[in-house]
Amino acid sequence: VHGCELEKARIAGLLHDCAKCIPNPKKLSMCAKAGIVVTDFERKNPFLLHAKLGAYVAEEVYKVKDPDILSAICWHTTGKPRMTQLEQIIYIADYIEPNRYKAPNLADIRKLAFEDLDLCMYRILRDTVEYLKENPKSMDLTTEAAYRYYKRLIEEEEE
């Protein structure tokens, strides 16, 4: 998969949502007990914590020790600037999963996922930012930073 270690991608893919079904109040209390830093935005939108908490659960419950896998799980929801190839693959795979059908440009993004990870990241983040601006929702600062990073990266490649 894009030259990425398949076993790492497999484990991260299987475990990336391992904390998703935990009720939001419990997510907050588990993060507090585990010493996981929770931003004000995450406190107001605790569903986002399933990524950070998922990395913790993967390590503590499933005994995953590989920092690359744990990081891919941690960042699969918000993204971040300068994502590793594995982080990008898990982020993109989460976005293009078969049960998703409402996202704009999904067919193009699914095709792009097999061609250019950086451009695919930019397109997903661009669509996410546009969606969040059109709807009365605020945006995680890390997602905004990721969008700016990939936008700049793609613009530099086009020059």
Predicted regions and their residues:
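Charged phosphate-binding loop/patch that engages nucleotide di/tri-phosphates or the phosphate backbone
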Residues: 130-159
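N-terminal hydrophobic signal/anchor transmembrane helix of membrane proteins
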Residues: 114, 129-130
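Divalent metal-dependent catalytic cores for phosphoryl transfer on phosphate-bearing substrates
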Residues: 1-123
